[in-house]
Amino acid sequence: LKAQDYENQKVHVVKKLDKDTTELMLFAKHGYAHSLLDKMLQKNRVTKRYFALVHTSDQLKQSAEIQVPIGRKDGSIIERAVVDAEHPTAKFAHTSYEIVKTQAHFTLVDIQLHTGRTHQIRVHFAHLGAPLLGDDLYGGKREKISRQALHCHFLSFKHPITEQEIMLESPLPQDMQALLENA
């Protein structure tokens, strides 16, 4: 920002980091651009793709769409679960994925969110019997990694002013890469 002579301007965080998830960060240099980008996120006009290391499961297909509702797990204010559509907290959730690489005990999947529900990826993959490595809230084991093995590696959106298509990519973080190389 110093190089662009923006050092005295306020920078606005558009995309916040989720706890225990590595991801691309999105910032706006102006308040107006921030509000436009925030609305784009709310209306699912930002494409987000994630890499996840999940426990290998027979229920995983080479590629698939997961379209089941998610709601609060009964008796919890934190946990979510796949619920019936009639459940009072049910919200439609849509995730698509493709297997990138399968190891003996875990699988690397490339995931696209079509909706943005709380814990959506974690709940959908736990529902398939393939919880994320390190995700002890939803059944993943922490013996190989100390956090949930989830990384937002791709963001795509139209610039809020120029409407130019912006695509951002980030490689796998060191801890996830090491697991793949040492399996």
Which stretches of residues belong to each language-model region?
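RNA pseudouridine synthases
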Residues: 1-183
